[in-house]
């Protein structure tokens, strides 16, 4: 559990310049509109950016005042690998909702990419990027 000091969190709706970033997380999931996507599964890439005041964590240099990145990674992994959604929008929304519910922050940005999607041609990825606030 994270200790919250005065001023940490959403700062009363004010701009929070600090960020925690988890970039390029790779998971194997079973999401998609087509049956084959849900049966065979495929690789998904997820980026997460949390906006919160990190001054207490930096000042104390104590994880008790911060967010454990490994726990955050495991939460995202569980959502991507153990649940199934038709759309990347649904997957991104679930990640944002769970992260906002479990951690003290002003907002979260979630990007989900599906590399080499079934598009009938060559393409790097399909993707969505959403930002949600408390």
Residue spans for each PLM region:
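N-terminal, polar/charged subdomain of small-to-medium soluble alpha/beta proteins
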Residues: 2-7, 11-134
